[in-house]
Amino acid sequence: LAVLWQSLGAADGWTLSHYGRFFSFTSSANLLATWNSVLVSCLSVILAALIGVPLAFLLSTFDFPGRKACSALVSMPIVLPPLVGVLAFVFLLGESGLVPRGLSNLTGSNSASCALTGIAGVVAVHGYSFSVFFFTFVSSALENRDTSLTEAAASLGAGKWLRLRRVTLPLLMPALVGAAIIVFMTSMASFSAPLLFAGELRVLSVQLYSTRLSGDLRLAAVQSVVLSGVSLAFLFALRYWNNRRRVTMATKGTRGRRRSLPRGLTRWLIPSAGFVVSVIMVLPHLTLVLLSFIKQGTWTFRSDAWFPAVFTVENYRMALSLARPLANSIQMAFFATLGNLVVGVFIGWLLAVKRIRFGNVVDALVMLPWALPGTVVAVNLLTAFSTGNVFSFGQVLAGSVWLLPLAYFVRNLPVVARSAQSAFVQIDPSLEEAARSLGAGWWLRFRRVTLPLIAPGVLGGAMLAFVTALGEFVASVLLWVPANQPISMAIFGEYREYRLEVAAAYGVLLVAFIGLVFFVSRVAFGSKAASEV
């Protein structure tokens, strides 16, 4: 509301002049940036679906040796924080990346002509990074479907394509819509990929950042409102369309089992395709590790060598000697997640157990930060806390060390609240009633009955919130101060200083720590918590 107020405000009252500046055809930079953002987001949804959906069908339908390894490798993009993933693509597909250098040596052409830049580069990064949403959502839907429906259609003479179009796809539509919403909104909010790959291409998230730095706060507020409006319009449009076409399963069939591979050439083509795609999905990770061991200055933008020749561990020594940013990120993510746990569990309890009045309104308000782009959340916080108010106990938080962890808290609260709500809903009320009948008080019932049942789901959501906050970049770029520099800004700083090898070492350390969090989640909290993450 503070940003909306600022976008309409003027020295002498209310005005729409700032919106007139945004939608002006004489200076169409903002309109062009909006159109480019929508175009990039739509193309990202299409490419992510083209990658993730076939992989989900392949790995959920057939059983073959190495299938679990392929599934794990296909899911690897989720452990790459946004900035680290984009940097890995710069080293792999940028003007001086491994692939353009290799093609240049093979063809004799300029490596820059073989690089992915502009809209193609941004969409490629988004398609790779966000395909995991389509893969995860569709895989879950396929594994939970009732195969008796397709068997009944087959018994009535329906062919494969007819069964796919009339039975399977309608049942998968909620998963497809959910993944499309997340990919579109994440692409609209994406900052690092357009910043490093777009070149002269204007997108609204980068335009908002530039406007904010120039000091034009009114126009930045308008850009925030428009960016939020586009994302929310897409969200509500897809949800409305999906609700009108909702299909449910009303049978007592069993979940289908994976089929063995057919005989003949297909028996070898299917696993081969799975392994090839899996290797492609981990190429950015391997590129990041490779670059982190290269000696600084021996493989630069001006070097003609396709592959580096001098390796060292000095980059890791330098990164570890300047480990304060990583410690800052861990500390801020920890306290933000701790707050998410306390507030999120309370909200989930109110919505699922107490079923308070206007619960739908509370649920929508809680989920709003997840629907808004990170840049908009950052601008909202800067605007709201640029002066003292009751929520900050009269203190000005803008420019302080407190605003960035607050952004992590606000941004990830919906994840923990929704996981807590789902966990509470799954508890059979008769369990707590039995404990009450035996004389157990509220605290004893919660500690011995409720808490063990909700712990896996809630801790899974908390782990996801922690990992997201740990590598957050979009809000950090607007809110960080030197005293709390996060790891993402340290990586970006090394990149801007052309110390790419140290930036890669930072990235590997961050990815390794996130992988450790995933491992601890699975070992300590079980597979349910890990699946939540």
Predicted regions and their residues:
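A short glycine-centered flexible hinge/capping loop motif at secondary-structure junctions
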Residues: 48, 156-158, 438-440
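Short cytosolic juxtamembrane segments of multi-pass membrane proteins
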Residues: 149, 247-259, 431, 440, ...
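Glycine-rich helix-loop "coupling/hinge" segments at transmembrane-helix boundaries
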Residues: 12, 191-214, 300-305, 473-500, ...
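Helix-loop-helix hairpin linking two adjacent transmembrane segments in secondary transporters
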Residues: 206-230
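Alpha-helical transmembrane segments of integral membrane proteins
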Residues: 237-273
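Juxtamembrane inter-helical linkers in multi-pass membrane proteins
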Residues: 159, 246-261, 297-313
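Membrane-water interface segments at the C-terminal ends of transmembrane alpha-helices
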Residues: 1-13, 26-143, 167-192, 196, ...
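The alpha-helix within a helix-turn-helix
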Residues: 153-154, 435
